[in-house]
Amino acid sequence: VEEICGRGGTGIYIHADVGVPEEIKHLFRTAAERLGSVDILINNAGITKDGLLMAMSEADFDNVIDTNLKGCFQMIRFASRRMMKQRYGRIINVSSVSGVAGNAGQANYSASKAGIIGLTKSAAKELASRGITCNAIAPGFVKTEMSDVLPDEVKENAKKQIPLGRFAEPEDIANAAVFLASDKASYITGQVLLVDGGMVM
């Protein structure tokens, strides 16, 4: 927010849990009151609770599905109501290569991210007539605090699966989101943009 304001923009911070509908309502109501409209939604909230399928608890499965998939659904539901009235909107959902190809030890996470892809395509078909596009980004490995703690051996093995030979920078994912939110992508909807260095083809 400080960086946005420092560059001459208007930014506000609103804390909300995507699993609590009342907090989501408050988020959109406050954003509309303070900023005037809701034009772009990027669904990026997500958690992981990794474990092998046979040992995974129902609670760990449900928590990941509820946050990653149901939270995305709730955010789209509330945002699209406002976007439909103004007949314009850009919805960008963050999926994952795990949702495209699966990943051992991440049955819950992969299921949630695959669900986001199906949700994206359904929302795109329902909302297109109101001038709203809905697309997904599927990142591969990204340089973040989460990936920084991985053992070096794991990171090197992961890089061997990536034709470009490196993890994505956070800016690589941000650039994809900026493109899909822009007028340059006004004729693109219901698509999944893999930003993974060629990991999944």
Where are the language model's segments positioned?
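Residue(s) in the substrate-gating loop at a strand-loop-helix junction
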Residues: 96
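Short, small/polar-rich loop/turn modules that mediate ligand/substrate recognition or access, typified
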Residues: 37, 128, 133, 169, ...
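The beta1-alpha1 cofactor-binding region of Rossmann-like NAD(H)/NADP(H)-dependent oxidoreductases
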Residues: 15-27, 58, 171-172
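Active-site helix of classical SDR
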Residues: 76, 112, 120
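Alpha-helical segment proximal to the catalytic Tyr-Lys
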Residues: 81, 125-129, 186
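Substrate-binding pocket helix/loop in short-chain dehydrogenase/reductase
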Residues: 24, 52-53, 60-65, 147, ...
